[in-house]
Amino acid sequence: MSASAHSRGAEDSGLSAGPSATHRGRGPTARRPTRAPDSGSTDSGGDSGGDADSIETQFWEEWPVETKGSDVNDEAIQFEYTAVEGEGVPEVDTHFAQAETPWMREFALEVQQSLNDLGVPVNLINVQPSTRYGEFWRADVGHPMPITMNLHGPDPQRGLDPNPFLMRAHPETGGNYYNYKNDEVTELLDEQAQTIGDTEARAEICGEVAQLLNEDAYLIAANFPEVITVANTADWEGYIPTPGNGTTRDSFIWTQVNLQPQGDSTTWVKGVTSGIQGTNLPFSSGGQEEKRLLNVYDGLFDASPQLEIVPALATNADVVDDTTVEMDLREGVEWHDGEPFTPQDVKFSVEYYQENDAPQQAAFVRPIDSVEIVSESGGGRVRFNLTEPDASFLTQRVVRSAIIPEHRWSDIDSPAQYNPDNPVGTGPFSFVSWEQGSQIRMEKHENNWMWDDDIRRELVGEEYFVAGDGIDEIVWANVGNVSTLIGAMQSGDIDAIGTTVSNAQADRAANTSGVEKQTARNYVPTDVHLSHLVPLFRDKTFRVALSHAFDKEGFVENTLGGRGEAIEGQNLLTPILTPYHAETEPYEYDPETAQEMLQQAGYTFDGDDNLVWPEGDAWDAFAERVENGHASRQDLDQPDFS
C-alpha cells in the first residue's frame, strides 16, 4: 500500500486478534444504525437498490454522570464522524500540541503514518497547550475530537499510585477523556480502589485491569521518553534527577532546596517558555501556575526523589480503620507572615476546598467526609473520616494537598476570583514579586524544615544530598522558545532551562563550558487517545489493527535517539511503579498483518489504497462489533470476509 495519498500537513491487517484475546460476551445494545439518505450504496442486507446504513458518533449506553450518556447525545456530542456502509472511511481530525515537546510534531506524523498505512486519511491540527486543556480536554464530555495525543505531565502522584492513570478508564472520573466504558474493568477498578492495607492484593487486581485494557487496545501507549534538561553546573551543585521531572522542571522542589552556590551569585535563574496567569493555587487552572506556586505551599506529605512518600506538614499517618486516618503535624512551623501553623489550618483548608469546589484540590478532598482536631499539643493531631475506603488516600491524595492559612482565606467569599498580591504559605520559598508575562521571584523561607541539613539528607537521600545554606532566591524568567533559552544559557543569562529539550538541543547547549546535559527516567507516557464514541474506534478489530501499525521501537530509536523506552502493549503504568506495574503482551509492529485483519473483518481498500467501510453481511458484523465495543471478529465468532 501507499500511504502518501492520505497525508496532510501538520499545519492546518485474520492473523491475530491481539494479545490474549478472550470472549467476554456482548455489551449493552446501542442505538440502531440510521440510514444515510441518498448515499447510492446498497443496504445492510446486501440487496441492491436501497440506501446505505450508517452509524453516527454517539454515546452507546447510559453513563453514571449526567453530562455523558445515550440520553444526552444531542448535547454531549461535539463533533461528527459517521460510518456509511460501503463508502470510504472519512478523514480523522487528530489534535496535537507541537509546543508541548521538541519532538511532538514528529510523534504526530508517526500517528498519521500509522493510520495512513491502514488507509485512513488524517488531518493533523496543531493547537496551543495553553488553550487545549480548557477547550479540548473536557471533563464534562471528553475530547471533542476523534484523536488527541499527549505527553503527560510529571505530577508526583503519577509516580506513586496506579490510580492517576488506571482510573481514567472509569466512567465516573473526569479524566476519562476518551469516553471508554467497560463494565468488567469498572468493577475491578472499584475493587482495587477500596483494597486497603494489602498492597499485594491491590497490585494483583491492578494487573488484571492492565491485562484487560491491553487486550482491548483501548488507546496507544507509545513510550516513556527520557527527561532531558540543561543546567549550569559550574556555579551550582546539587541538581537532583527526579524521575519524570528531571533536574530543572517544576513538578518537584528537590533541586531548588538542595542547590548550593559555587560562585558569587545566590540567586538561581530558571528560564521558562511561559508565564503564569495568577497567584491562586487552589483555584487555578493547573499547569505551570500550580507547579510553581507549590514552592510557596506545603502539603501533608511529599514524594521523594526515589518516589517514596515522605513527611511534610504531617510527620506520620496512622490508619485507625478502613475509613479513618490520623496524622501528627510538624511542630514549630510558621506561615510566611510569622503566624503559627495549627491543626485548625488543616481542618479549614479541607472544608474550604469542599465548600468552594477548589479544582486543584479536588483529588485531595474528594474522599474526605470530615476532619477533626484530635489534639493541639506539639504540632497537633488531626483525624480524617473518609466516606469510603480509599487505597490512594495516603499516596496520591495527600501528596496533592496544599494547606492554606485560615487567617488569610477565611474572609474571601469568592475564592475562584481571588488573586492574592502576596500569597502566603509555609513552603521553602516565600513569594516576592510577579511581573505578568515576564518573571516570578521567590526567596528562601528560613523557617522551613527543608533547610535543615539532617532533615534534607533524610528526605533526598545520601546519593543526592549536598550540605550548605542553599540559594537565597529563585527566579523564573519567561525567556521565550527553546532556541532562545539555549542562547540565554550559553550567554549566562539563566542558570537552567525549566522545560524538556531534545537530545540534539541539549548537546548544542552543552557545548558551552559549565553547561551540562542532564537526564532522568520517566514514569509518564506519551499516548494517543482514541474517542470510543467514534464508530471506527468502537470497533475493537480496528483498534487492534492500529496497535500493530504503530512503530513504537522505531520512534524511540529514530526520533528520540534511543533516549526512551518503548511501551510493551497498551499499558500506561511504568515499570518504575512497583509493585503495580504488570507485564502486558506487546503488539508486534506489522502493518501488513494489520491490513489483513481489517480485510478479514470486512473492510476493503479502493484503488488508491483508501480504507472502505464494510457492506452487506460484513456491515452487519461491523455493526455488531461497534455495538459491543469490546469484542473483535474472533471474539464474536464472525466469519472471515476477506
Residue ranges and their predicted role:
Residues 1-33:
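N-terminal export signals
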Residues 49-91, 134-143, 163-191, 224-269, ...:
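Short, solvent-exposed loop/beta-turn-alpha elements that line the ligand-binding surface or hinge
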Residues 52, 89-101, 196-216, 269, ...:
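Alpha-helical secondary-structure segments
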Residues 88-93, 113-128, 325, 384, ...:
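A local structural motif
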Residues 113-170, 270-271, 338, 489:
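Periplasmic binding protein-like
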Residues 150-154, 374, 432-443, 475-534, ...:
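Extracellular/periplasmic solute-recognition and catalytic clefts
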Residues 316-359, 383, 536:
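Aromatic- and charge-enriched surface segment that lines or borders ligand/interaction sites
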Residues 318, 363-411, 423-435:
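Surface-exposed binding/hinge segments that line
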